[in-house]
UniProtKB/Swiss-Prot annotation:
This is Transcriptional regulator MraZ. Gene3D superfamilies: Transcriptional regulator MraZ domain (3.40.1550.20). Its main location: cytoplasm. Keywords: Cytoplasm, DNA-binding, Repeat, Transcription, Transcription regulation. One of its GO terms (molecular function) is DNA-binding transcription factor activity. Belongs to the MraZ family. Residues 5-47, 76-119 form the SpoVT-AbrB domain. It is found in: Cytoplasm, Nucleoid. InterPro entries: MraZ (IPR003444), MraZ_C (IPR035644), MraZ_dom (IPR020603), MraZ_N (IPR035642), MraZ_sf (IPR038619), SpoVT-AbrB_dom (IPR007159), SpoVT-AbrB_sf (IPR037914). GO terms for cellular component: cytoplasm; nucleoid. One of its GO terms (biological process) is negative regulation of DNA-templated transcription initiation. SUPFAM superfamilies: AbrB/MazE/MraZ-like. It comes from Mycoplasma capricolum subsp. capricolum (strain California kid / ATCC 27343 / NCTC 10154).
Length: 132
């Protein structure tokens, strides 16, 4: 199980070191994809495929299924964790989500989320405001 919040920095080569507690629970390859919010998600292969099936099963319209498949598959890359526990995040994913050097890595049970530090702080503030 993946859990916790970790603050990390991407290096100049767009590599991000995953916390040891989290990377020890993941095995290569892993899947990096755009989340449904302003984040990136990291999945194991089995959990990623299961999640896609669940999303697609909730949709009855064939066009909507194709549209969701396009979004998911075209924004997903298979990556590996190197010997130092780093992943390389493709530039197009960083750019499309405006992810900055400073990030939060969130463990959310079966996946990780990577958020720009500023965006996550703003998102968290909005959530707390909505629930107070």
């Amino acid at each position: 199980m993946l859990f916790g919040t970790y603050e990390h920095c991407m290096d100049a080569k767009q590599r991000l070191t995953l916390p040891a507690k989290l990377r020890n629970k993941l095995s290569n390859p892993i899947y990096l994809t755009k989340g449904f919010e302003a984040d990136l998600e990291i999945w194991s292969k089995d959990d990623f495929l299961l999640q896609i099936k669940e999303h697609l099963n909730k949709i009855s319209d064939q066009k909507d299924i194709r549209d969701l498949e396009r979004i998911i598959w075209s924004n997903t890359v298979e990556i590996g964790i190197d010997n130092l526990g780093r992943i390389k995040i493709p530039y197009n994913l960083i750019q499309s989500l405006n992810i900055e050097k400073d990030v939060f890595i969130l463990g959310l049970g079966n996946r990780l989320e990577i958020w720009s530090k500023n965006k996550y702080n703003q998102h968290k503030k909005e959530l707390l405001k909505e629930n107070s």
